[in-house]
Swiss-Prot record:
GO terms for cellular component: cytoplasm. The lineage of its organism: Eukaryota, Metazoa, Chordata, Craniata, Vertebrata. Expressed in the thymus, bone marrow and spleen. It comes from Mus musculus (Mouse). This is Maturin. Residues 107-120 have a biased composition (Acidic residues).
């Protein structure tokens, strides 16, 4: 995928997150992202013919520890798309952005569903005769 296509993917991703693509350097194949309150990171994109993977980093010491999850994900087996990498970065930064953890949301929804169930009526068990 050429760099402009990657930048388009990044712009589309930004439209559904608090992040903004603040710089896209084609010569360096680098994209810089920013979100309030001071959360920033950049992605280095691999060349088309190169087997390299994406690389994420932050020049902010406050942000850098949160990128470990995304960095581990990128270095794991298999090719990753830019969208997959950005989603993992977003998940990593949720606490810094003041958002609930994505996994917590799923658990709360599941718990809420369980709590809303009405008690089941007593049904006769199969194979047990009632006399």
């Amino acid at each position: 995928m050429d760099f402009q296509q990657l930048a388009d993917v990044a712009e589309k991703w930004c439209s559904s997150t608090p992040f903004e693509l603040i710089a896209a350097e084609e010569t360096e194949r680098r994209m810089d992202f920013y979100a309030d309150p001071g959360v920033s990171f950049y992605v280095l994109c691999p060349d088309n013919g190169c087997g390299d993977s994406f690389h994420v980093w932050s020049e902010s010491e406050d942000c850098l520890p949160f990128l470990q999850l995304a960095q581990d994900y990128i270095s794991s087996c298999g090719k990753k798309t830019l969208h997959e990498v950005l989603e993992k970065v977003f998940k990593s930064f949720r606490p810094l952005l003041g958002l609930p953890d994505a996994d917590d949301d799923a658990f709360e929804e599941y718990s809420a569903d369980v709590e809303e169930e009405e008690p089941e009526a007593d049904h006769p068990q199969m194979g047990v005769s009632q006399q």
